[in-house]
């Protein structure tokens, strides 16, 4: 009897153990995965962004833009592929996040009380202010009270942060009125202000500065807000795994200086604005560039052809017969020795000049020290194109002596004007140089380049708006291994 009881006891223990293991297994399987685990298991980071000249656009070497570069770096940290969903208006961004169709919204959007109620912000990565925009030559309101006295209403993007700002202001200014426009974006409203279709709108300071490169008639009436933080947005849940990694990611970028480099790359040149020069450039862009565009594309090689075009405009204003008292000539304003070194026989021949200028710049870029970040090498090369490689290296050495970073264009460009001052150049290997001119030279080219990008983006968006409805989104898969994906990457349109 005791043997039977002992046997039954063992059987009972086995049954109970099996049940416990089964139940434990069920609990493990039923425990929900964190957002971070889901992304890693999926192997894809899904990011929604705006198709504009700051967040994301297709350049000559594939996708680019501040938010794109950041999203790609974050996907690499996660060791997953990046799936970009670009939208043309704000209206589709947050609904897609609510439906869990994307993991992150990365679209240079400000943190507002309204957004905080529904969504979780990531770390702040720069600041913008909201500005009232009007067209030069029209009446300029100086304050909110002036806006309440207008016959013409302010027009803003529906459900934007600007609408939230105006709703608050209306509590103090009951007569403040405005119109809202759905299925559009800020850049489209800015264009309408420039063409006179509407009188006033609100825009953030960075977007306005970039758009002024295409529409120089736009001007700031006054600022409505102080600086506001810009961040990515996530779903509002108790799961903070994705946000925690984002905090770590942006912290590393700031500490390493990489975030500052990206900001310099995309809007380090926007502070200075020359109305007359920009208007002249836009006219030349429309009337002259189409004739020379094929040659810039033909000889650009690894360069973005628009960059080469911007350099040529700075040199000659796209005049193939340009000459200067110093002896430089042609579209790329080559000296005789430089022309001979790159095989140019006739500097006034536009094709030879463009080919020679591109080759000369290519050689300079190769000489720039490898300690300098790849995307910043071009600015050092341009400074060399203007004042000579030796003077550029002098500026780097001087920057280091003064406690700056000789590999940072931001630091070096600030010290270029010192090459004019005897107390500095007397100790430099190559002596005096017009460093201030080189500084302006590089920044001008960056602005012209931005204008061409913005102009092309505007034309492309016109076509896209005709082809796609507002709800249509393009999903673009960016392979982890492709730092510069080609334009011909696979694009799948979701209906």
UniProtKB/Swiss-Prot annotation:
Protein name: Membrane-bound lytic murein transglycosylase F
Membrane-related topology note: Peripheral membrane protein
Domain note: The N-terminal domain does not have lytic activity and probably modulates enzymatic activity. The C-terminal domain is the catalytic active domain.
Gene from which the chain derives: mltF
Origin superkingdom: Bacteria
PROSITE patterns in the record: PROKAR_LIPOPROTEIN, TRANSGLYCOSYLASE
Stretch list, region LT domain: 272-495
Region Non-LT domain: start-end pairs: 31-270
Gene source species: Aliivibrio fischeri (strain ATCC 700601 / ES114)
Cellular component annotations (GO), alphabetically ordered: cell outer membrane
Keywords: Cell outer membrane, Cell wall biogenesis/degradation, Lyase, Membrane, Signal
InterPro entries named among the record's database cross-references: Lysozyme-like_dom_sf, MltF, Solute-binding_3/MltF_N, Transglyc_AS, Transglycosylase_SLT_dom_1
Catalytic reaction equation(s): Exolytic cleavage of the (1->4)-beta-glycosidic linkage between N-acetylmuramic acid (MurNAc) and N-acetylglucosamine (GlcNAc) residues in peptidoglycan, from either the reducing or the non-reducing ends of the peptidoglycan chains, with concomitant formation of a 1,6-anhydrobond in the MurNAc residue
Signal peptide start and end residues: 1-30
Any single GO BP term: peptidoglycan catabolic process
